[in-house]
Curated annotation (Swiss-Prot):
Gene: hisC
InterPro entries: Aminotrans_II_pyridoxalP_BS, Aminotransferase_I/II_large, HisP_aminotrans, HistidinolP_aminotransfase, PyrdxlP-dep_Trfase, PyrdxlP-dep_Trfase_major, PyrdxlP-dep_Trfase_small
Name listed for the protein in its UniProt record: Histidinol-phosphate aminotransferase
Subunit structure: Homodimer.
Keywords, sorted A to Z: Amino-acid biosynthesis, Aminotransferase, Histidine biosynthesis, Pyridoxal phosphate, Transferase
Protein family according to the UniProt entry: Belongs to the class-II pyridoxal-phosphate-dependent aminotransferase family. Histidinol-phosphate aminotransferase subfamily.
Lineage: Bacteria, Pseudomonadati, Verrucomicrobiota, Verrucomicrobiia, Verrucomicrobiales
C-alpha cells in the first residue's frame, strides 16, 4: 500500500515552495563557473553580512557543541529595545517564515480561512493549505497596492488570519498609514492581522504598525534579518505581538529553534546601523539605475519600495531561461500569476550592469 493512500490529502495537493535558483545548481546544470554567475533572484543583500556579524560567528563557532539559549534572551532583549516594546512581546524564528508557520499552527484548521493579496509571498498559501485552511485571494488595486477594503469584504466569521505585506513581495508597493489605520478600525476582533515587513528598511516612509502591538490589538508584526541585514543563510526572523499572542506562538515553537551562530550574528548585525545604511543607499542607487535602463529600453516596470523591481518583458519564463543560460539568475513570476513579468533583485553596480546587458541581449 502506498503511503500516500493514508496521508493528509491537503498535504498531497500542495505545491512545494520554489526558491530562487541557487548559484551552485545553475553552475552544475550549465557547466558554468560559479564565480561567473550573478544571482539576482532572492532579494539577498549584495553587500553581504555586516563584518561585525561575521566576527561574532567566528567567536561563537567553538561553542556549537552546547545547545543555544532556547529563549534567545539576549537577542530578544535587543530586538525589544530596538523596536521599543517589551521582551514578552517578541518571538524569534528561523526566518520570519517560521513565525508564519507558528501562526498557522496556532490558529488554522480545516474550518478556518486566510485572507491575503492575490500577488503575495507564496508561503502564505502553502502554510494555509498545509493546515487545511481555505486561502482567499483579494486582487490588488490598479496601482498594485493591497485593496484593504477588499480584504474587509472578504473577511467572514471563519477568517482567522489576514496577511498584509508591506512593502509587498513581489510587487514592491506600500500601503500608507491612513489606509492601515482605517483598516484596523474596522477589522473584526476574531481576526489576527499579520503585517509582514521583511522589506521595511528599504521603504521611504514605512507606516507605524507597532502601535497596534502597544494597544494590545490582535496583530503580529514580522521582520527579518535576511534582507537588509544580510543574514539570509542563517535564517533569522522575528515577530512583535502583544504578550498573549507571543505566548501562544511560543507554545507552538520547537525547542532551540534558533542556533547559537544565528543568535550571535543577529545581535551583532542589529547593532551595525552603518552597514544597514550602506545597504539601503546601494539599493537606492541600484533602483535608479534600473528605472533609467527600463525607461531607455521602453519597458514597463512597477516603482518599488523593496530591494527588487518587477519589469514586464512579455515572455517571463523564456526571458528567465535565456538569462539563466548566460549566467544571470532572475525570478520568473508565472508562479505569482504574472507570466509576463520578471523580478530582479538589486545587486551591486557591477551586477546590475551585467543584468541589463544580458536582458538587452535576450529581448
Amino acid at each position: 500500500m502506498s503511503i500516500e493512500s493514508f496521508a493528509n490529502q491537503h498535504v498531497l495537493e500542495l505545491v512545494a515552495y520554489q526558491p530562487g535558483k541557487p548559484i551552485e545548481e545553475t553552475a552544475r546544470e550549465l557547466g558554468l563557473n560559479p564565480h561567473d554567475i550573478v544571482k539576482l533572484a532572492s532579494n539577498e543583500n549584495p553587500l553581504g553580512p555586516s563584518p561585525k556579524a561575521v566576527e561574532a560567528i567566528a567567536r561563537a563557532a567553538a561553542g556549537v557543541n552546547i545547545y543555544p539559549d532556547g529563549a534567545a534572551f539576549r537577542l530578544r532583549s535587543a530586538i525589544a529595545e530596538f523596536c521599543g516594546v517589551e521582551f514578552g512581546q517578541t518571538v524569534v524564528g528561523t526566518g520570519s517564515s517560521e513565525v508564519i508557520e507558528l501562526i498557522c499552527h496556532a490558529l488554522l484548521n480545516p474550518r478556518a480561512e486566510v485572507v491575503a493579496a492575490k500577488h503575495a509571498f507564496s508561503m502564505y498559501p502553502i502554510m494555509s493549505k498545509l493546515f487545511g485552511a481555505a486561502y482567499v485571494e483579494v486582487p490588488n488595486k490598479e496601482d498594485w497596492t493591497h485593496d484593504l477594503d477588499g480584504f474587509l469584504a472578504a473577511i467572514t466569521e471563519n477568517t482567522r488570519v489576514v496577511f498584509i505585506t508591506n512593502p509587498t513581495n513581489p510587487v514592491g508597493t506600500v500601503v500608507g498609514q491612513q489606509e492601515i489605520d482605517d483598516f484596523m478600525a474596522k477589522v473584526p476582533e476574531h481576526v489576527l492581522v499579520v503585517f509582514d515587513e521583511a522589506y521595511r528598511e528599504f521603504s521611504d516612509n514605512p507606516p507605524d504598525t507597532l502601535k497596534f502591538v502597544r494597544e494590545g490589538r490582535n496583530v503580529v508584526v514580522l521582520r527579518t534579518f535576511s534582507k537588509a541585514y544580510g543574514l539570509a543563510g542563517l535564517r533569522v526572523g522575528y515577530g512583535i505581538a502583544p504578550e498573549p499572542v507571543c505566548s501562544m506562538l511560543h507554545k507552538a515553537r520547537a525547542p532551540f529553534n534558533l542556533h547559537v551562530l544565528a543568535q550571535e550574528a543577529a545581535l551583532a548585525a542589529l547593532e551595525d546601523r552603518e552597514h544597514v545604511r550602506r545597504t539601503v543607499e546601494n539599493n537606492k542607487e541600484g533602483m535608479r539605475f534600473y528605472e533609467q535602463a527600463f525607461r531607455e529600453m521602453g519597458l514597463e516596470w512597477i516603482p518599488s519600495q523593496g530591494n527588487f523591481i518587477l519589469v514586464k518583458v512579455g515572455r517571463g519564463k523564456q526571458v528567465f531561461q535565456d538569462m539563466l543560460a548566460r549566467g544571470v539568475i532572475v525570478r520568473a513570476q508565472d508562479g505569482y500569476g504574472l507570466p509576463e513579468w520578471i523580478r530582479i533583485s538589486i545587486g551591486t553596480p557591477a551586477e546590475n550592469a551585467r543584468c541589463i546587458e544580458v536582458l538587452k541581449e535576450v529581448l
